[in-house]
Amino acid sequence: MLRAGVSTACLYPRVVEEALYDLALSGVSHVEIFINSHSELRRSFVDTLARLLQRFDMTCASLHPYTCEIEPNMLFSNYARRVDDYLEYCRYYFTAMQQLGAKVFVLHGNKVPAASVNKDMYFTRFRRLAELGESYGVQVTQENVARCTSASLPFLLEMRDALGKQARFVLDIKQAVRSGEDPFAMLRGLNSHIVHVHISDHGEYGDCLPLGKGRFRFDAFLKELAAVSPDCSVILELYRSGFSDVAELAANYTLLRNRIEGKR
């Protein structure tokens, strides 16, 4: 069954442990943790987060790395040694994910337009990272991001065909809208390869709104998602300017959870 959750990134720049605590006190039981600095990958710090999850009977679906902005330079440049270094660095993330019980690692990827990117290199580098993740019990996933190569659905379809089972995707609704892509078309194209979703609403008041504040047919979307990827986590990911306080964020999480469970 689909599972509703909230990203700690919604409360940025509140530090991650306080954001997680706020979500816990608000009744959120499933989260994505956004790591914002290297010190937050230290085993003792991650243990603090893990104890907090255990204390409130919460689960962590996924981890978002703070190094997403340097992925083009580290993972997809022509300087091969950087790739080796970045793969080694990702062991910090994957070890933290084991401590947290998280399975999904979110990758933004390169920023070269899809029309001019070296696709063979891209897919080979992604596969190397995916294989490393698998050795830790982690799924490395490609998120669609408007400013990145992954903005393009045709590129993601090529990635799916090239990588097969190792092609796993995070579908971000607001990023699809910003890219001029139809979220439903992305869902239907990538199908069961979608293992994680960042959800929000959109309409005339913005492209990253709380659910129910825009025109996104999220009930229909959730129904289609459940049919092709029933074990997916659906994570509410909003910007801090998009809601008034934690109570409003928690209420939107409850709305999402109820819709997934068929309640009104």
For each feature predicted by the language model, list its residue ranges.
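Short acidic/polar active-site loop segments enriched in Thr and Asp
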Residues: 29, 103, 195, 232
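Distinct, well-ordered alpha-helical segments
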Residues: 15-20, 46, 50, 116-124, ...
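Active-site acidic/histidine proton-transfer and metal-coordination neighborhood
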Residues: 17, 72-168
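Acidic/histidine-rich catalytic cores of soluble enzymes
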Residues: 30-31, 63, 128-215
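N-terminal pre-domain/capping segments
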Residues: 1-94, 98, 134, 168, ...
